[in-house]
Amino acid sequence: MTRFFCCGSYFPGYPSYGTNFHRTFRATPLNCVVPLGSPLGYGCNGYSSLGYGFGGSSFSNLGCGYGGSFYRPWGSGSGFGYSTY
């Protein structure tokens, strides 16, 4: 679970963040702030800017597989609001 940086399923306890990601997803784990030097950091790096953990509107970019689950962009345009369901 170290290479999940916002793209992993380390949010198993916060599946509801998908809706109110900006307030419910407050669970932003420190794992999300992993060094962007990671392979998936290319798209997830945007999270640091948003402070969310989804990589801004580059959600399609950080299609890191979301922890093996299908990442579904809740904010079809926002990019920050995926569901690890």
Swiss-Prot record:
Residue ranges that the Swiss-Prot or TrEMBL entry lists as coiled coil: none
This protein's record includes keyword Repeat: yes
GO CC, one annotated term: intermediate filament
Superkingdom of this protein's organism: Eukaryota
InterPro entries assigned to the protein according to its UniProt record, in alphabetical order: KRTAP7
Record keywords: Keratin, Repeat
The keyword Cell cycle belongs to this UniProt entry's keyword annotation: no
Tissue specificity statement from the Swiss-Prot or TrEMBL entry: Wool.
Residue numbers spanned by region 12 X 2 AA repeats of G-[YCGS]: 37-82
Pfam families: KRTAP7 (PF15034)
Functional summary from the UniProt entry: In the wool cortex, wool keratin intermediate filaments are embedded in an interfilamentous matrix, consisting of hair keratin-associated proteins (KRTAP), which are essential for the formation of a rigid and resistant wool shaft through their extensive disulfide bond cross-linking with abundant cysteine residues of wool keratins. The matrix proteins include the high-sulfur and high-glycine-tyrosine keratins.
UniProt cross-references to PANTHER family, sorted A to Z: KERATIN-ASSOCIATED PROTEIN 7-1 (PTHR38504:SF1)
Subunit structure: Interacts with wool keratins.
Family classification: Belongs to the KRTAP type 7 family.
Protein name: Keratin-associated protein 7-1
Species: Ovis aries
Biological classification of the source: Eukaryota, Metazoa, Chordata, Craniata, Vertebrata
Annotated gene: KRTAP7-1
